[in-house]
A protein has these predicted regions:
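Intrinsically disordered, low-complexity serine/threonine- and proline-rich regulatory segments
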Residues: 1-14, 21-25, 59-94
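Positively charged, polyanion-binding regions of nucleic-acid-associated proteins
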Residues: 6-28, 93-111, 137, 142
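Short acidic, hydrophobic short linear motifs in intrinsically disordered regions
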Residues: 23-47, 111-127
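A short, conserved structural fragment
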Residues: 56-74, 137-154
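Short, amphipathic alpha-helical interaction segments positioned at domain boundaries
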Residues: 77-116, 160-191, 195
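Extended, charged alpha-helical interaction scaffolds
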Residues: 88, 95-137, 144-148, 153-155
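Helical coiled-coil/dimerization "stalks"
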Residues: 120-123, 152-166, 208-225
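Amphipathic alpha-helical oligomerization/assembly segments
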Residues: 183-224
Length: 225
């Protein structure tokens, strides 16, 4: 089955896979939790700022494609969502824990080297070494419908990067990452500046409070003398 998903659909499914593995007690996810996962600043490339409405629309599209299902617990009025991706339900698409972890990281962070994947996917599945990651990537490339491709090595780089192949052809991986990555870097810069400004403001407040305490102590000492 040839999968052609948009970047937003890939992000939603990647988040559902990640949270199922790393926080099973909180899975399936509510719309709010899913939106937070999509916009998470750590382990994401690019960083996104999706509204609940956009995430809901994306989820609805995935439900129509039978890749996500809505789940409501007994007595609960809040719908929760779980993926049906890479499971036994899809037969040939069922993956091992290591394959699933690698695919999830590629979906959440885009093209990566085996070394990067080992460090980042370790939270979801155990890899004995980088060679283990490379074998997993080869298995994903050698399937009847390849799920991963090896990208041309960049000049001066020792390791080649690998990318998933489940994106819509209308959204080339490299082009999307290059465009979105710039926005991500800008956003990251704004976030860091904002954090520094908040820290400075907090320090200024603390200094002002200390100055008041010192003045109070001086006044008290003066009165005693």
């Amino acid at each position: 089955m040839k999968l052609q998903l948009s970047p937003l659909e890939i992000r939603v499914i990647g988040v559902l896979i990640e949270k199922e593995i790393t926080t099973p007690d909180q899975y399936p996810l509510s719309l709010n939790a899913l939106s937070n996962g999509c916009n998470q600043k750590s382990n994401r490339e690019p960083v996104m700022g999706l509204t609940d409405a956009v995430v809901q629309e994306t989820v609805d599209q995935l439900i129509k494609k039978h890749l996500v299902r809505s789940h409501s617990g007994f007595g609960s009025r809040v719908s929760k969502y779980q993926h049906r991706f890479f499971t036994a339900e899809f037969g040939a698409l069922a993956l091992s824990p290591q394959e699933l972890a690698v695919m999830c990281e590629l979906m959440l962070r885009g093209p990566q080297t085996p070394g990067e994947l080992r460090g980042r996917a370790e939270r979801m599945a155990r890899f004995t070494d980088v060679e283990h990651v490379e074998r997993t990537l080869n298995d994903l490339m050698e399937r009847g419908e390849p799920l991963v491709a090896r990208l041309p090595r960049h000049p001066g780089k020792r390791e080649a990067r690998y990318a998933h192949l489940i994106g819509d052809e209308a959204f080339p991986i490299e082009e999307f990452m290059a465009t979105a990555g710039t926005g991500s870097a800008d956003q990251g810069g704004h976030d860091r500046i904002g954090a520094l400004e908040r820290t400075v403001a907090e320090l200024q407040t603390q200094v002002a409070a200390l100055e008041e305490i010192v003045e109070s102590l001086i006044d008290s000492a003066g009165k005693r003398t």
